[in-house]
Amino acid sequence: ELTESSEELYYPILDRIHESLHEKYIEGLYKKKIEQFDAKDDNLTLVQQYIYLTKWVSKDLDDEALNNIRKVFELMKAQGYKAILRFAYNHAGLNTSGGESKQWILRHIEQLTPLLNEYIGQIATVQVGFIGAWGEWHTSPLANDQDAKNAIVSALLRALPVPYCVEMRYPSHKKALTLEQEEYRGRIGYANDYFTAGEHSHAPGNDFVPNTDDYKQITGEVKANNFYMSGEIPYNEDTEWGLAALITPMKSLRILREHRYSAFDITQNFDLNIMSWKQVKVYPSLLNDNNILFDESYFKDAEGNEVVRSFYEFVRDHLGYRLNLQSESTVEAKNGNLEYNLTITNTGFATVINPKEVYLVLVSGDGQVAKEIKLDVDPKTWIPSTNEEPNQVAKYVIKGSAAAGLSGTYKVGIWMPEKVADLKYNPAYAIKF
């Protein structure tokens, strides 16, 4: 029989965790944030991890630095998290200088490369930080050094294995780059650190405002390359740059879909916009009217009864990918072979960005996996809809036959583990349907 999990995959950003490498790490590093932002039932799987190299700004990363970074990854692994990483030197903020230089940033990327590759299965993306206050590319001796920026982005792209992505802040930053390997440009996504749905007075030039050249550029790029996109709302502050007003939920939803967001911060503006999203209800008719894709099963419980969803829940559950095994899928045993004809849809905002393998597995009555059958498919191609039919959910058919090599009665399932060997059999890092 063909079985499918009812679990859901959630990919919001858990929190901005700012840590200097000389600080002590504790086992409850992320648990406290889960409790602080009322997310115990959200099954969050992603954290934005800042790592400050302040102490080493003009010298080699020593064993202390590298071992502490390793501790961060091991803590994340123990709790089943992946990370959006950002390295920086200046955590003091504006009107200060971290003293960073092209020479030492390139040296540090060189030193970090083996470690990044060792833990690549726990990395969602790496933001191109290093320069400026909080790694935001301002308030820096390198602010106007384009040669340094070219070299740093090129080095970081080389450090990560293809097809893993990096993120930059603005399309203008990306346009200005001269890369050492131009073919890597499609691996540069964006981190929208000022998501306001274009509704703040400072949105132009800071947010990606609908109908602007920047917005159109990102829309075209993400369709062509399916790179990583993430965002965060400004803090709820009655200041020039704060956001002390509610932004329009459906407009936000359309942006998340059009720019194929994979992650979103739930901590900034938590007490205003995020809490409001938890109260606003979303209905199938409203989504249909706005051409937002979804699977009908999302609005039903296990018994088939209709359920009401909040805007927060819908965003939480559709960031990145949301894979659905369709009811017409079949798996049959014939003459010692397993014949499969599977139909999968993806109603998430984006797709499976980083490498995953796809298997059929035969599961015995006692719950043990008796056989793994690897399928020759690339889930990154499972985009939610095609350019030809942008408002229709695309269907992906996986059809074939494989020698079962077993006799008896088994359940059949789809297994999509992390490709990296040390995480392959860690269920926390497998895709859930």
What residue spans do the PLM features occupy?
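Structural preference for beta-strand elements that scaffold enzyme active sites
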Residues: 8, 44-48, 80-84, 123-127, ...
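Catalytic cores of secreted or luminal carbohydrate-active enzymes
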Residues: 253-328
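Aromatic-lined substrate-binding rim segments of carbohydrate-active enzymes
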Residues: 30-90, 103, 160
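Extracytoplasmic/secreted cell-surface and envelope-processing proteins
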Residues: 56-59, 92-97, 134-138, 175-178
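Catalytic-core regions of glycoside hydrolase
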Residues: 125-132, 136, 140-281
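Boundary/entry segment of secreted carbohydrate-active catalytic domains
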Residues: 1-45, 50
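An active-site-proximal structural segment forming one wall of the substrate-binding cleft
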Residues: 64-82, 98-127, 147-159
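Extracellular/luminal regions of secreted and cell-surface proteins that mediate adhesion/ECM remodeling
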Residues: 313-433
